[in-house]
Amino acid sequence: QTNQGFLRNCNQAAKAARGKYVMFLNNDTQVTEGWLSSLVNLIESDSTIGMVGSKLVYPDGRLQEAGGIIWNDGSGWNYGRLDDTDKAKYNYVKDVDYISGAAILLSTALWKQIGGFDERFAPAYCEDSDLAFEVRKAGYRVVYQPKSKVIHFEGISNGTDGNGTGLKRYQVENSEKLKEKWKEEFKNQCVNNGNPNPFRARERSMGKKIIVVIDHYVPTFDKDAGSKTTYQYLKMFLKKGYVVKFLGDNFLHEEPYSTTLQQMGIEILYGDHWATGIWDWLKLNKDEID
């Protein structure tokens, strides 16, 4: 048997899948506790979710990607690359344009319906972005799960030189193929003006209303009536389709309540820097908040 490259190897191996889900995990990764169960729990929590993926972290602890962004010009971002993985904006469940194929999970039925990775992108690169667009075309969402943390030794498998002789050279070529295939869909992506604000692009909130809720602290909804009321309001906003941000006046990340809200898709603005940073954040994003 010969190595057919990432894409064709995945397509070939997935033909043998007999389980409910197909999980793709790169051979240059190291998983952490709960990485798989958190993916499965998320995809099983909502029938509109078609594919889920992990938070990717470099071996030195810095963030590699908290979901990916595709701009209207076809350019892409690994959102949060080289930043602090513990920042609030990287730790809530959210829709994303794509998730790098180093760690993604989707149902076997949907995988077969789509037909697997599109072989025009063989041997590798952009097949994961393309798959995400195919999942949405089929009527499902692509969602990032921060609780699934996977360490990715990026570059070890495929090299790092985009213009060299390794597989990385296909990155530029396949980017053009991706733009051509999805040129109509790209018209609805967030605009790259040279220095774009990723506020909406990072969570595919284009066309949605965004609400910021400020209270004394993260609602301890099983302890007091006020918190329970706030919690019910937050759930109501989500049900109505709002994108919800929450700021506790004490700027704390309080468990298990903070994680509960984050897993519902609420971004919690926690950390001491928010005591002064909230004003800069509001100034930067004021036109996006309803």
Question: Can you annotate each of these PLM segments?
Answer:
Residues 29-71:
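Conserved donor NDP-sugar-binding/catalytic core segment of glycosyltransferases
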Residues 22:
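Short aromatic/hydrophobic "clamp" motif used to bind/position activated sugar donors
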Residues 241-269, 273-276:
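N-terminal strand-loop element at the rim of the active site
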Residues 217-229:
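A short, glycine/small-residue-rich beta-strand->loop->alpha-helix junction that serves as a flexible
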Residues 33-40, 91, 95-115, 120-151:
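A short, conserved alpha-helix in the catalytic core of glycosyltransferases
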Residues 1-17:
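Glycine-rich, basic loop-to-helix element that forms the pyrophosphate-binding segment
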Residues 25-27:
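Catalytic metal- and UDP-sugar-binding loop of GT-A-like glycosyltransferases, i.e.
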Residues 50, 60-61, 73-95, 100, ...:
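C-terminal, non-catalytic tails of nucleotide-sugar-dependent glycosyltransferases
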